[in-house]
């Protein structure tokens, strides 16, 4: 239990930050699913368009340290490889 004024404030801030970060992680997962759905549909143009937006989202979340930079790089790499494999 937070006893000091500062500790109570930090506890309030932590709750607020957690909600914000959770919404960003959810947005990230949703955008990744959209890319995978476009890949499964076989529409390379749509997949590339959605991937560009998703790539931006992944980078923003990694910059804010909500997701680790290596995790972000891995996600982008795997999605990019899946899109490139569609042409083959």
From Swiss-Prot:
Keywords: Ribonucleoprotein, Ribosomal protein, RNA-binding, rRNA-binding
Top-level lineage group: Bacteria
Spans annotated as Disordered: 1-28
UniProt-listed GO biological process terms: translation
Presence of the UniProt keyword Ribonucleoprotein in the record: yes
GO cellular component, one term: cytosol
GO molecular-function terms, A-Z: small ribosomal subunit rRNA binding; structural constituent of ribosome
Functional summary from the UniProt entry: Binds directly to 16S ribosomal RNA.
Family per record: Belongs to the bacterial ribosomal protein bS20 family.
Name this polypeptide is given: Small ribosomal subunit protein bS20
Gene: rpsT
